[in-house]
Structures are given as structure tokens and as C-alpha cells.
């Protein structure tokens, strides 16, 4: 099994939800994900029930980018190692898309601009049904450190209204409380 390309991204959390307001803001978190593009299936099962990685390959092709030399779609497989809990609001789908796009770029020596990466991630997330809005602000936050305020109605290349490098990680702490724990505590009272 050969690693054709490798990409990384990180999780994020919403500060302002785009679906209700048309403006979204998300902040990067120190939760990493690494995606590898492989020529054979990974030894570890990749859980992609929503098929966002398949949709992402289609977005890559629609954008006019090549597949790795000598490989067809059916020859490509993924390996994912993630510290981002799924379905907890920590932007695991957006981070997976960004890391996978970076792996494709690494495998093909094609390096789309950041706004092109966000556009392909948004297209894949909507096509796979994991997002109604494309999670544009989430993809930006998974792509770069800090936080961004994004106008999701604007063209992606022009949609970042404000951004900031973020807080010094030494100055703040994010606590992740599993949903099951909060349900248990609610029933005890």
C-alpha cells in the first residue's frame, strides 16, 4: 500500500451560526486530523457513512483537477486519523474535506488557493448531505488557525469579512463534555 498524498487540518467550533443569520463565524481548535490518499484500502476501516469523501473526489474532478498519475477513481482509497469527535459540532466533516483536499493536492502537485479549497469542501458537504449551507465558515476555520467572520452569501473568495489570528492557546482552555455525560447529569437532578 503506497501513500499517494497526505493532508492535515484541524477542528473548529462555531461562534455564530450561518444558517440563521447569513454570517458565520468559527474558530479553529487544536484537534488535528490527517488524511492520506492511498492506492489500496487502509487496514483501518474509514467511517464515511455520508460518503463525503466520494463527493469530495467528484468536486475535485469538477474543478478540473487531475487524479494522481496512473490512477482511476476506483484505485483511490483513504486513510483517516482524527482527534476530532464526530457529530459533536467540532467540524469533523469540514476538517476531513480540507485534509483530504490537501492530500489530493500533495498527490497531484496541484495546490488550489485557500478559497478554492473552501469552495470544493462546501460543494462536497452539500452534495453528501452533511451541510445545508456548505459550512463555508467551518471550512475556513479548519483550514487556517484563528477565527473568521464570513458572509456566506458572498462569493467564497470575497466572503471573509474579518479574521484574527486567535487567542494564545496558553491563555484559554476548551472543555469537551460528551453529550452522554450531559444527559446523565440532567437525569440525576
List each language-model region with its residue ranges:
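ATP-binding N-lobe of GHMP and related small-molecule kinases
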Residues: 1-88
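Short amphipathic
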Residues: 2-9, 170-178
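Local beta-strand/beta-hairpin segments that build beta-sheet-rich folds
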Residues: 4, 15, 156-162
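Solvent-exposed alpha-helices and their adjacent loops that cap or buttress functional pockets
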Residues: 7-8, 17-18, 26-29, 131-134, ...
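Short, structured patches in soluble enzyme cores that scaffold and shape functional sites
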Residues: 39, 143, 152, 171-180
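Gly/Ser-rich oxyanion-binding loop with an adjacent helix/lid
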Residues: 73-158
Amino acid at each position: 500500500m503506497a501513500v499517494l498524498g497526505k493532508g492535515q487540518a484541524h477542528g473548529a467550533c462555531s461562534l455564530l451560526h450561518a444558517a440563521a443569520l447569513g454570517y458565520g463565524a468559527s474558530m479553529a481548535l487544536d484537534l488535528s486530523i490527517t488524511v492520506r490518499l492511498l492506492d489500496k484500502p487502509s487496514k483501518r476501516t474509514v467511517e464515511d457513512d455520508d460518503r463525503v469523501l466520494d463527493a469530495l473526489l467528484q468536486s475535485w474532478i469538477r474543478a478540473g483537477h487531475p487524479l494522481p498519475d496512473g490512477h482511476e477513481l476506483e484505485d483511490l482509497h483513504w486513510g483517516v486519523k482524527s482527534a476530532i469527535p464526530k457529530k459533536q459540532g467540532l467540524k469533523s466533516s469540514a476538517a476531513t474535506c480540507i485534509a483530504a483536499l490537501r492530500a489530493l493536492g500533495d498527490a497531484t502537485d496541484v495546490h488550489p488557493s485557500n478559497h478554492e479549497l473552501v469552495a470544493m469542501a462546501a460543494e462536497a458537504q452539500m452534495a453528501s448531505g452533511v451541510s445545508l449551507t456548505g459550512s463555508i465558515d467551518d471550512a475556513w476555520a479548519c483550514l487556517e488557525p484563528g477565527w473568521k467572520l464570513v458572509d456566506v452569501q458572498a462569493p467564497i473568495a470575497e466572503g471573509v469579512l474579518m479574521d484574527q489570528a486567535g487567542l494564545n492557546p496558553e491563555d484559554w482552555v476548551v472543555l469537551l463534555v460528551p453529550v452522554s455525560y450531559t444527559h446523565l447529569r440532567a437525569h440525576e437532578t
